[in-house]
Amino acid sequence: MERQQQQQQQLRNLRDFLLVYNRMTELCFQRCVPSLHHRALDAEEEACLHSCAGKLIHSNHRLMAAYVQLMPALVQRRIADYEAASAVPGVAAEQPGVSPSGS
């Protein structure tokens, strides 16, 4: 069971990576390659693509670092909120998208 969950997580990670990669490729190509009249990229297009991809990768790393720093605090806050809600008698812990009446 755990192995299947790991495989599913790996597939999700791969899918997410490919989505980011494809979006980055599309964005940089549209920005840096104005025409398809030549088979090869010229030096200016190559430099533009290198710069564009570098900026996007750097931005992605900074966002991921911020996410990694914030995540423990968010998890602790959610745990505290859940514990506080479950400590109050007669009050069911609210879950996003689920109404307390079960409907």
Curated annotation (Swiss-Prot):
Naturally occurring in which organism (per UniProt): Homo sapiens
Cellular localization per UniProt: Mitochondrion inner membrane
PANTHER family for the chain: MITOCHONDRIAL IMPORT INNER MEMBRANE TRANSLOCASE SUBUNIT TIM9B (PTHR13172)
Domain characteristics, as noted in the entry: The twin CX3C motif contains 4 conserved Cys residues that form 2 disulfide bonds in the mitochondrial intermembrane space. However, during the transit of TIMM10B from cytoplasm into mitochondrion, the Cys residues probably coordinate zinc, thereby preventing folding and allowing its transfer across mitochondrial outer membrane.
Keyword Endoplasmic reticulum set for record: no
Presence of the UniProt keyword Repeat in the record: no
Biological role stated in the UniProt entry: Component of the TIM22 complex, a complex that mediates the import and insertion of multi-pass transmembrane proteins into the mitochondrial inner membrane. The TIM22 complex forms a twin-pore translocase that uses the membrane potential as the external driving force. In the TIM22 complex, it may act as a docking point for the soluble 70 kDa complex that guides the target proteins in transit through the aqueous mitochondrial intermembrane space.
Family affiliation: Belongs to the small Tim family.
Motif Twin CX3C motif per record, residues: 28-52
InterPro entries (UniProt xref): Mito_inner_translocase_sub, Tim10-like, Tim10-like_dom_sf
Name of the protein: Mitochondrial import inner membrane translocase subunit Tim10 B
Disulphide bridges: C28-C52, C32-C48
Main subcellular location of this protein, as a coarse class: mitochondrion
Keywords tagged on the record: Disulfide bond, Membrane, Metal-binding, Mitochondrion, Mitochondrion inner membrane, Protein transport, Translocation, Transport, Zinc
Gene Ontology molecular function terms on file: metal ion binding; unfolded protein binding
Subunit structure as annotated in this protein's UniProt entry: Component of the TIM22 complex, which core is composed of TIMM22, associated with TIMM10 (TIMM10A and/or TIMM10B), TIMM9, AGK and TIMM29.
Highest taxon, organism lineage: Eukaryota
Membrane topology: Peripheral membrane protein
Expression tissues: Ubiquitous, with highest expression in heart, kidney, liver and skeletal muscle.
UniProt GO cellular component terms: mitochondrial inner membrane; mitochondrial intermembrane space; mitochondrial intermembrane space protein transporter complex; mitochondrion; TIM22 mitochondrial import inner membrane insertion complex
GO biological process assignments: cell-matrix adhesion; protein insertion into mitochondrial inner membrane
